[in-house]
């Protein structure tokens, strides 16, 4: 994952805890209902979400003067990191008006660009247990299920849902006074340096504004921790990826230990062991009108299988299942020379994939699947986000990457997006209507969160990719280059040409 990752809060000093709380705007967390499930059924949990601290207004205590404007610090308020943390406060958020975040029942909608007094790009939110603590998920021998609508996410965008090994209180007990209520304590496996506050000090020393992002920059420090990417996706490509670290919890890095000169110098695995169906050789599995049809909402099931079938076992396998239109769809099978034809992430899969693609073995060197399992056992925070990529334009997800390699080389092609796509200036300028919707989050015992009707339990069974009737159903594919399925539509819908490759019934 290559996210814009920003952490505010954390201080180990006893004199003053870093990152204060502002009083200019009340903080009202949007509600989000989700479910805990067992073989007996599912029970509602009345949850809430909070906005990551980095998106929030950061101002001088007791007035309205910005501590940080654009991508620069005010050095009169922030002459050094310690003083800055003592002087600056986080404030409440206007979720819908400023950030384009709305919730309704079990659904959370994140708009990519929101125009208010200023232009906001993207967002990152965390599921809360209460108003002061994040919900902690222990995922071993469990499954996590959610619905997602990526139909309005084009090339270059990423609707990412993942877990991060953050502190439940956002560091409030030891490092700051704002805490999880205000979205503090973020970290991930990229050891991001675009974090404004870390270990109770502003990351202002050595800070340089980004040359292509008016809101971000990088400082001397970064925040590292384990990350389990359940879902990184747009309408063209998707991937799920474990990223282990050598040490538990949030670890601060500095200089080259934050990958300043060497991507693989950190304590965490930046690459992960990813399963992207397109990259793994099935180029007709995921996308508009494909087996998993991104024109429609998708139910995504991820299972964390242990070696002894108990919560105390060792992580052995990470499985992926989809449900769409009441049908269970098994994950695509690998079709790459040198990799066994499976459809899940295991230690063997990761070893073979790294060898077949010629990738660095940073995943194995940081503990591999066992290391990821340890983080899952300790507990992780759920992150829901939408973002674009100012580093490499999201090509690692949906196009050819790296660009200096031949697309014919195994592992280079990850999707059908153009090599010129995903530039932030383009996707941000053409962002009308771009959004992601997450809904129906469920967590519980294996096979308790879904069945052939999309919920409730039962063992998965495979489905075909084409309807049995001679006419296509409403919203189904009815034409396009290479299409061999039905070309007539069930009444009252008719077939409409969307592009050369895809026609749809509506």
Swiss-Prot record:
Short name of one Pfam family: Glyco_hydro_7
- Please list which residues make up the signal peptide: 1-18
Q: Any idea which GO molecular function terms this record carries? A: cellulose 1,4-beta-cellobiosidase activity; cellulose binding
Instruction: List every stretch annotated Catalytic.
Output: 19-450
Record's keyword annotation contains Zinc-finger: no
Region: Linker; residue ranges are: 451-473
Q: Where do the segments described as Disordered lie? A: 405-426, 449-472
Highest taxon above the source species:
Eukaryota
Note the SS bond partners: 478-495, 489-505
Q: Which reaction does it catalyse?
A: Hydrolysis of (1->4)-beta-D-glucosidic linkages in cellulose and cellotetraose, releasing cellobiose from the non-reducing ends of the chains
Active site positions, chain numbering? 227, 232
Q: Give the Polar residues compositional bias ranges.
A: 406-419
Q: Which residues are glycosylated?
A: 308, 447
Q: Which PANTHER family match?
A: 1,4-BETA-D-GLUCAN CELLOBIOHYDROLASE B, GLYCOSIDE HYDROLASE FAMILY 7 PROTEIN
**What family is reported?**
Belongs to the glycosyl hydrolase 7 (cellulase C) family.
Q: What is this protein called?
A: Exoglucanase
